[in-house]
């Protein structure tokens, strides 16, 4: 199925590009989430009429993400979990825990934006975690996990 991208999509294309994707990906994800539209003649004309306003909105979203990223860069997120004497946690620190803690400190971050390359944190100490605020804005933060003896 050919679609017009209404937003930048990672590994697919930028705003305004006409790309070919599998039908299920378009129907079940891209179109319902508002990131794309079927590439019909009328849709192309409508898109060209709205192109400037969509590009302006995308630029504003990017600028906002960059300002939040500058504030968030280098931030340390402190979490306390129950741990054994050897420093291993009973359970783990997930992206949901980190997102909740960042939200408490005043940043609007969802768990889907937290990138944990090594999976959940299972030991006490400091770990580096990335936060993807926008497709072009990736910020690295430090997560400090403190052990609480059970």
UniProtKB/Swiss-Prot annotation:
Coiled coil: none annotated. The keyword Secreted does not apply. Pfam families: Ribosomal_L9_C (PF03948), Ribosomal_L9_N (PF01281). GO terms for biological process: translation. It comes from the Bacteria. SUPFAM superfamilies: L9 N-domain-like (SSF55658), Ribosomal protein L9 C-domain (SSF55653). PROSITE patterns: RIBOSOMAL_L9 (PS00651). One of its GO terms (molecular function) is rRNA binding. Keywords: Ribonucleoprotein, Ribosomal protein, RNA-binding, rRNA-binding. GO terms for cellular component: ribonucleoprotein complex; ribosome. Binds to the 23S rRNA. Belongs to the bacterial ribosomal protein bL9 family. This is Large ribosomal subunit protein bL9. It comes from Albidiferax ferrireducens (strain ATCC BAA-621 / DSM 15236 / T118).
């Amino acid at each position: 199925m050919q679609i017009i991208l209404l937003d930048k999509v990672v590994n697919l294309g930028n705003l305004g590009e006409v790309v070919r994707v599998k039908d299920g990906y378009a129907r079940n994800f891209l179109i319902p989430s508002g990131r794309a539209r079927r590439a019909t003649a009328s849709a192309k004309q409508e898109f060209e009429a709205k192109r400037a306003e969509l590009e302006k909105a995308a630029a504003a979203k990017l600028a906002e993400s960059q300002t939040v990223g500058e504030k968030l860069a280098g931030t340390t997120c402190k979490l306390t979990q129950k741990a054994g004497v050897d420093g291993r946690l009973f359970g783990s620190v997930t992206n949901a825990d980190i997102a909740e803690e960042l939200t408490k400190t005043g940043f609007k971050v969802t768990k889907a934006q937290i990138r944990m390359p090594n999976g959940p944190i299972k030991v006490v100490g400091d770990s580096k975690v990335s936060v993807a605020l926008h497709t072009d804005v990736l910020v690295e933060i430090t997560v400090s996990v403190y052990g609480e003896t059970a």
